[in-house]
Structure formats: structure tokens, C-alpha cells
């Protein structure tokens, strides 16, 4: 049975004081725009759901904000190739969701789209995706692997924050920036390869991770405050392109014993595993796990705040 009617979307918990023309078809409520369909509500359901590519002959191209966020018994969802956008909080906080298949036409994934899907096991983002909203997969505690498609150039704020079972991340060489807290508190993430395309690593991007060693490629020019703070690092290699290193980048890395800067770097250098500016007049960071006594070189005229924090 198909019913078209005017409804106050707030009555369905979709938004406040928004009036829209919507259509009910089986388990979905949707709106039509320019001959295509956006699903704005799914009747509460459990188990596996395959979103149709067409409804009544019209392509389903969008999943609206919060469309499935009440389907707490949902275990699996398949998003068809017809869909090009997944809205904010579209699948937010679905504790039983273990599997998501994202269609090959999706270009944007909204803020918090899959956040707190605490049983989700893996994430594969297709090459078609060019935009991932902040915290899109944050606190997906059981996710062990993430594959990011070729279309993504920026990993935004907190996208995989607190994915504490995450052990494997595959980033393409198209990524140029890793944002604020993007992988923060991924405590099982012991190894990561930062692509040669990355130019900036944001504030706290890998803070609280289980990383044991990291090589910062020559393409990177800036590393934000606390980028690797409180991680499990034992060694770090900084490439030739880095010209800006924020405060506390390696703060509370109590296992870190050695920081190495590539000789060709124009702004920074290292000696005896300690990070300095190029002229070695400013001591930037003493690794927190450095053992024994350390004598500050005679030429040092300034020491950065927290340079010896937690040593």
C-alpha cells in the first residue's frame, strides 16, 4: 500500500519543525526530488536490510540524516550503487550492526554517519567517495581493518577516533591531509604507513595509538600539536619536508628512545636521538624513553616547553 501525505517530520523524530511531502512504501519513508528518491526514515527493523536501488521506478540516490539511527537491531546493511550520498548520523549508534556494504557510486559520507556502531568489524570505503564527514566511523570499537578508496584526499576530524580494535589501515597515495584526532585513541593500531602524498598531520591525529614506530615521509610539511602524543612509539623518522612541528608532538611517549631527522631537512635535525632545530640551538624534544643521563649540548640557547615532559 502506498500513501502520500503531508507530515511533520518531527513527529517521526527525524527533525524539528520541518514539513515535507513524503511517501510511505513498505518499510521506507522517502522524499522525491528531481525524479530521484532520498530515504528519510526506515521503519524499525532488525537483521539484514538491502536498500533498494529503485522504488516505483525511481532511483534511490540518497540516505537522509538519521534515516536508520533508530534501527538498533539492524545487523547488516547493503547500500546499492544507485546511492551517491549518506547523510549525517544516517546509521548512528547501531550496536548490532556488524557488516556494511557501501555502493560504488557513493561520493559523500556524512558526519557521524556510522559512529558508535560498536559491533562493526571492517570498513571499506569505495573509490567513488571523495568526502568523509567528521567522526563518520568514530567509536566503532570492533572495527579491525579500514580500507580507504582512491577518491579520498582528506581524512577529517576524528573520522576513526576511538576505533580501539583497529589494527590495519590502508590509505591511498591521494590523501594529502590527516586531520584533528583522525586516528586518536586507536589503541591497537601498532603500525601505519603514511602515504607519500600527505602534506599535513593534524592536532592529535595519532595520539593515544598503539604505534611502535613511524616514518614521516618527505612530503609532510607540518605536524600538529600532540600529533603522536601518548602513543607506543619506540622510534620516529622525520622526513626532509617537515618545516613545522607543533607542541607536544611526542609528549608522553614513554617508550620512545630515538628521534631521527633526515639530513636534508632544512628546519630540524637530531643528535643522540634528540630533536633540535636545524642549527641545534633549540632543543625541541627529548624522547620520553631515553635512558640514563643526558647532557644538554653547549650550543643550546632555548628549550621548548615540555621538551623533557615525562622523561
Could you say what each language-model-derived stretch is?
Residues 38-40:
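Extracellular adhesion/carbohydrate-recognition regions
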Amino acid at each position: 500500500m502506498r500513501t502520500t501525505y503531508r507530515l511533520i517530520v518531527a513527529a517521526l523524530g527525524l527533525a524539528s519543525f520541518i514539513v515535507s511531502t513524503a511517501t510511505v512504501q513498505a518499510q521506507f519513508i522517502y522524499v522525491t526530488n528531481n525524479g530521484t528518491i532520498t530515504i528519510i526514515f526506515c521503519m524499525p527493523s532488525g537483521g539484514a536490510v538491502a536498500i533498494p536501488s529503485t522504488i516505483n521506478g525511481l532511483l534511490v540516490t540518497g540516505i537522509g540524516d538519521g534515516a536508520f539511527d533508530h534501527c538498533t537491531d539492524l545487523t547488516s546493511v547493503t547500500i546499492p550503487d544507485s546511492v551517491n550520498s549518506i547523510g549525517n548520523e544516517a546509521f548512528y549508534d547501531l550496536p548490532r550492526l556488524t557488516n556494511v556494504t557501501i555502493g560504488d557510486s557513493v561520493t559523500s559520507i556524512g558526519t557521524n554517519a556510522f559512529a558508535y556502531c560498536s559491533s562493526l568489524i571492517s570498513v571499506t570505503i569505495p573509490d567513488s567517495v571523495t568526502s568523509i564527514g567528521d567522526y563518520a566511523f568514530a567509536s566503532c570499537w570492533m572495527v579491525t581493518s579500514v580500507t580507504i578508496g582512491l577518491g579520498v584526499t582528506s581524512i577529517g576530524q576524528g573520522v576513526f577516533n576511538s576505533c580501539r580494535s583497529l589494527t590495519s589501515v590502508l590509505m591511498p597515495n591521494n590523501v594529502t591531509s590527516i586531520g584533528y584526532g583522525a586516528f586518536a585513541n586507536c589503541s591497537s593500531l601498532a603500525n601505519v604507513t603514511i602515504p607519500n602524498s600527505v602534506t599535513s598531520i593534524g592536532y592529535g591525529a595519532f595520539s593515544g595509538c598503539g604505534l611502535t614506530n613511524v616514518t614521516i615521509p618527505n612530503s609532510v610539511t607540518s605536524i600538529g600539536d600532540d600529533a603522536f602524543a601518548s602513543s607506543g612509539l619506540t622510534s620516529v623518522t622525520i622526513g626532509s619536508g617537515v618545516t613545522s612541528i607543533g607542541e607536544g608532538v611526542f609528549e608522553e611517549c614513554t617508550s620512545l628512545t630515538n628521534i631521527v631527522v633526515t639530513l636534508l631537512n632544512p628546519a630540524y635535525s637530531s643528535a643522540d636521538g634528540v630533536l633540535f632545530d636545524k642549527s641545534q640551538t633549540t632543543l625541541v624534544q627529548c624522547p620520553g624513553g631515553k635512558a640514563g643521563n643526558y647532557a644538554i649540548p653547549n650550543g643550546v640557547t632555548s628549550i621548548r616547553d615540555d621538551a623533557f615532559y615525562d622523561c
